[in-house]
């Protein structure tokens, strides 16, 4: 009962200080982790492995029910969850159980199947969320010109404020963000709408400084225009929604992988690493803005969760997959002491990253 009261107090404080959007954040994160664990659960059950515990949240159990040999729980802290398979214990890396319904007796390939199912469910969930988003539509900046920079390519050919860019080299432009994706240093054919009339221009962009997706200053082709602030509802319906979902899933996955590489190489400063507070802030703002934007952020976080869990770090799914690949290739298991050492090292790395990300979040809040 005390645990239940603690959970209620946490939620009340969250709603009081962050409004109802805080509750939306808790639900989003809990749902994504639930879906991740559901992947492991279904994969394990499909191979006859006993799932001893399926918990939504961590900590003391608030509500639990036994069904077909599995203990289903709702635990105190809703930001997380886990499944406990018979014969697998992350806190005791060397633990094994040789019963016929145990994870321990499975072949490496079957273990990889179970391990990969969690991240895969996150990626599939994101794909279907993008399909829903495409059909509902998402408000984005319209490709309408606001300010025009002096001596820019746009000024030189006579583009004007409130012109709407319709096409670049025959490619339809729906949002302002799409403009930069189709620029090059070669002459471009640009179709615009000005006061109801379509006009065509030949323009060669100039090199200028701008920011990439990671906040780095880079040189790239520019028109020299900014948006006028008008928004437009962009929809991708029917079969087009599947193409949109595939593109968004691929772009988000690529962005995450590039971000990890840049973080490791030092191209992106470690202070940019955000944690649960940043995630809560972003999700809460999305919930305030619109339901579709909340779905978009949910899809992005789901892909993050899927990709990050595949990193080859012990204690993550990717680390366990790596151990099993080693066993498949070399026909022997990772030595027990090495396995335990790497597992505890992985645990320390993850804990350090969580603490560092939280420190960054708090420093950013204090700085504001």
UniProtKB/Swiss-Prot annotation:
Residues 126-197 form the PDZ domain. GO terms for cellular component: plasma membrane. One of its GO terms (biological process) is proteolysis. GO terms for molecular function: metal ion binding; metalloendopeptidase activity. SMART domains: PDZ. It is a multi-pass membrane protein. This is Putative zinc metalloprotease Cj1068. The chain crosses the membrane at residues 112-134, 291-313, 338-360. Its cofactor is Zn(2+). It comes from Campylobacter jejuni subsp. jejuni serotype O:2 (strain ATCC 700819 / NCTC 11168). It is an enzyme of class 3 (hydrolase). SUPFAM superfamilies: PDZ domain-like. The active site is at residue 37. Its EC number is 3.4.24.-. Keywords: Cell inner membrane, Cell membrane, Hydrolase, Membrane, Metal-binding, Metalloprotease, Protease, Transmembrane, Transmembrane helix, Zinc. Pfam families: PDZ_6, Peptidase_M50. Belongs to the peptidase M50B family. It is found in: Cell inner membrane. It comes from the Bacteria. Zn(2+) binds at residues 36, 40.
């Amino acid at each position: 009962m005390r645990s239940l009261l603690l959970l209620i107090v946490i939620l009340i404080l969250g709603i009081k200080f962050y409004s109802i959007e805080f509750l939306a954040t808790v639900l989003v994160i809990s749902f994504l982790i639930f879906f991740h664990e559901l992947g492991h659960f279904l994969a394990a059950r499909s191979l006859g492995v006993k799932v001893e515990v399926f918990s939504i949240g961590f900590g003391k159990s608030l509500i639990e029910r036994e069904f077909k040999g599995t203990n289903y729980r709702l635990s105190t802290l809703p930001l997380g969850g886990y499944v406990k398979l018979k014969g697998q214990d992350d806190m005791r890396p060397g633990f094994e159980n040789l019963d016929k319904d145990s994870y321990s007796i499975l072949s490496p390939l079957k273990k990889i199947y179970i391990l990969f199912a969690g991240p895969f469910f996150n990626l599939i969930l994101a794909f279907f969320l993008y399909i829903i988003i495409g059909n509902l539509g998402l408000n984005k900046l319209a490709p309408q010109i606001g300010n025009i920079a002096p001596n820019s390519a746009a000024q030189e050919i006579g583009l004007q404020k409130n012109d709407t860019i319709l096409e670049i080299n025959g490619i339809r432009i729906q949002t302002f963000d799409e403009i930069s994706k189709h620029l090059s240093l070669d002459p471009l054919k640009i179709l615009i709408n000005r006061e109801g009339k379509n006009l065509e221009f030949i323009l060669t962009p100039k090199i200028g400084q701008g920011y990439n997706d990671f906040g780095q200053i880079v040189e790239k082709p520019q028109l020299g225009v900014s948006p006028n602030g008008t928004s437009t509802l962009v929809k991708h319906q029917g079969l087009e929604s599947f193409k949109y979902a595939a593109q968004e899933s691929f772009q988000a996955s690529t962005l995450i992988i590039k971000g990890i590489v840049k973080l490791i190489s030092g191209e992106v400063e470690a202070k940019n690493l955000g944690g649960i507070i940043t995630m809560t802030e972003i999700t809460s703002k999305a919930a305030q803005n619109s339901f579709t934007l909340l779905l978009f952020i949910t899809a992005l976080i789901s892909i993050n969760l899927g990709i990050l869990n595949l990193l080859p770090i012990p204690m993550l799914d990717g680390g366990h997959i790596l151990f099993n690949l080693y066993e498949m290739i070399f026909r022997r298991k990772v030595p027990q002491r090495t396995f335990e050492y790497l597992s505890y090292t992985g645990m320390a790395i993850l804990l350090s990253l969580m603490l560092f990300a939280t420190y960054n979040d708090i420093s950013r809040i204090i700085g504001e």
